[in-house]
């Protein structure tokens, strides 16, 4: 068994664990026959920011309570380094996923998958006086609304 280094071009769109065949780069054939094929299993190192779901990239993005409640247009990172604009509609809950078409991983056919952006509403840890007063006013203005009311009602019925 011998050892040698082979250069191989890894095509765009390859996923973790996929096998690539390198024709004629394997062991020499018997009795002077042509060399066989070499199979390489690809390991894709996880990205610190982006995940992958098939041809789609995934990213989790923090948003403020105000952005989620009132709506906003936010900039999110993309793999190409150019931020992508995503519109967050008013009333967006934490965990909702938005799709930026064509901003994901490159497919084998040369097109791109999508960028799936999941928003996570961040709760402020330290409030200044004005922010605290604004939230207390909001709490007072929505005092009659209970987000758990339906859950409690359904639990009593079971």
Task: Identify what each model region corresponds to.
Residues 1-158:
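Charged, often glycine-enriched C-terminal and inter-domain segments
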């Amino acid at each position: 068994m011998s050892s040698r280094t082979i250069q191989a071009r890894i095509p765009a769109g390859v996923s973790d664990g996929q096998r690539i065949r390198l024709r004629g780069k394997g062991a020499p054939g018997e009795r002077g026959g042509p060399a066989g094929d070499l199979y390489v299993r690809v390991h894709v190192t996880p990205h610190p920011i982006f995940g992958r779901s098939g041809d789609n990239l995934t990213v989790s993005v923090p948003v403020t309570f105000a952005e989620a409640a009132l709506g906003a247009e936010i900039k999110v990172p993309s793999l190409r380094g150019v931020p992508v604009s995503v519109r967050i509609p008013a009333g967006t809950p934490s965990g909702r996923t938005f799709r930026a078409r064509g901003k994901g991983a490159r497919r084998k056919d040369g097109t791109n998958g999508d960028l799936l952006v999941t928003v996570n509403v961040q709760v402020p840890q330290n409030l200044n006086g004005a922010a605290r007063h604004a939230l207390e006013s909001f709490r007072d203005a929505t005092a009659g609304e209970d987000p758990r009311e339906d859950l409690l009602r359904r639990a009593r019925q079971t």
